[in-house]
């Protein structure tokens, strides 16, 4: 579960390395974001020649969380770190590569581009 002030790794090659959640999209009182949810983030660390710079505000979709995700078949899936992929207003990823596995839950949210770029879908 991601909330305001949560720090996440960036799982793409947009140039950002670490981001911090500053807003969870979806209602004025929404507190937590799970896998597949869109959040507003501030870039806290970035590469020198990346597409995004430190201090920029961007949108991101959560792709991995430490909090387990329960599946309809009863199985659970969790990751070691929280991670997100930066997206633009249209929902397309800013980067051209995705690092690390992503979950099947993104398919239900219509993030097909992220799923096709990911090396592994769990």
Curated annotation (Swiss-Prot):
SMART domains: Ribosomal_L14
A Pfam family that the UniProt record links to this protein: Ribosomal_L14
Xref: CDD domains: Ribosomal_uL14
Cellular component aspect of the GO annotation: cytosolic large ribosomal subunit
InterPro entries in alphabetical order: Ribosomal_uL14, Ribosomal_uL14_bac-type, Ribosomal_uL14_CS, Ribosomal_uL14_sf
Gene3D superfamilies: Ribosomal protein L14
Keywords: Ribonucleoprotein, Ribosomal protein, RNA-binding, rRNA-binding
GO term, biological process aspect, one: translation
One Gene Ontology MF term: large ribosomal subunit rRNA binding
Highest taxon of the lineage: Bacteria
HAMAP family in alphabetical order: Ribosomal_uL14 (MF_01367)
Family membership noted in the UniProt record: Belongs to the universal ribosomal protein uL14 family.
Primary role: Binds to 23S rRNA. Forms part of two intersubunit bridges in the 70S ribosome.
The protein's assembly and partners: Part of the 50S ribosomal subunit. Forms a cluster with proteins L3 and L19. In the 70S ribosome, L14 and L19 interact and together make contacts with the 16S rRNA in bridges B5 and B8.
PANTHER family per the UniProt record, alphabetical: 50S/60S RIBOSOMAL PROTEIN L14/L23, LARGE RIBOSOMAL SUBUNIT PROTEIN UL14M
Protein name (Swiss-Prot/TrEMBL): Large ribosomal subunit protein uL14
Lineage: Bacteria, Pseudomonadati, Pseudomonadota, Alphaproteobacteria, Magnetococcales
Gene: rplN
